């Protein structure tokens, strides 16, 4: 159990190191307004904190830096919520204020904005389309041979594709098909659409559409859409600006891992609900042993739909990043409910 004095010194060391990236010595601490102890007392308390494993000495300086154990204690026990600047809150809310909420577009823009606001790498795992439910479908003729099929899901996902309209299918048939599809398929999970169409809808269409076989073939192509989650990155190269990553081998290893989207799928796909903070070697990848990953899930009710994460150095602005992620996930969840 740390004393009040040790807690204050530990928090001050970590706050100072996060801001400066420079090891913190007793002289630096003695100049802080909140530290009213003598230099000798500060040195003794720092020695005790080092012995307990919360801070450690670097080879190049007489100062101390936080250890992984120190960061973990800081995040779990010393972190205070940070109020975000009003301009940033407005910028984020404006992103989600669009009349038509497209989850994929918002996910992509969220990754970009988060990377700019933090100067870290932002990763957003979009909703898995297979669990989305069909809201409606439109088929808009462009000319006699082509049309655009627009599929909208309950989470705001909009999938459009150009399809070929067989000569034997006239425009009145298209209109009948769309009406039947919306009546029978609205609310059906995307992953069940194919079976639903070919086991139930075909029999209904047979009674209304003249050139039935051609129409069914066109429908089959219309609903062939990718169902897996999409992953979006913002600021992939931002880690290069962090002083911890001036080692070429370390940077190469990290950037190679960031480029491996499959690995991030595995890291983000099974996150628990809420905010999670993984520090250093708590991360599963050795390339991330000098990094922290803060992630937050967004959902509708009890259904978890995706994950937003920030990858940065262990010397991360934890309070600010957590506040940003909380705001983003609230806005994302509210947008999906529209």
From Swiss-Prot:
Q: Which Gene3D superfamilies match?
A: 3.30.450.40, Heat-inducible transcription repressor hrca homolog, domain 3, Winged helix-like DNA-binding domain superfamily/Winged helix DNA-binding domain
* A molecular-function term among this protein's GO annotations: DNA binding
Q: Which domain of life does the UniProt lineage start with?
A: Bacteria
Spell out the InterPro entries in the cross-references.
GAF-like_dom_sf, HrcA, HrcA_C, WH-like_DNA-bd_sf, WH_DNA-bd_sf, WHTH_transcript_rep_HrcA_IDD
A Pfam family per the record: HrcA
Alphabetical keyword list:
Repressor, Stress response, Transcription, Transcription regulation
Residue ranges annotated as coiled coil are none
The biological process GO terms on file are: negative regulation of DNA-templated transcription
Q: Does the keyword Hydrolase apply?
A: no
Which PANTHER family is this protein grouped with? Answer: HEAT-INDUCIBLE TRANSCRIPTION REPRESSOR HRCA
Protein function: Negative regulator of class I heat shock genes (grpE-dnaK-dnaJ and groELS operons). Prevents heat-shock induction of these operons.
Similarity field: Belongs to the HrcA family.
Name by which UniProt lists this protein = Heat-inducible transcription repressor HrcA
Species of origin reads: Bacillus cereus (strain ATCC 14579 / DSM 31 / CCUG 7414 / JCM 2152 / NBRC 15305 / NCIMB 9373 / NCTC 2599 / NRRL B-3711)
- What broad taxonomic lineage does this protein's source fall under? Bacteria, Bacillati, Bacillota, Bacilli, Bacillales
Q: What gene does the UniProt entry assign to this protein?
A: hrcA
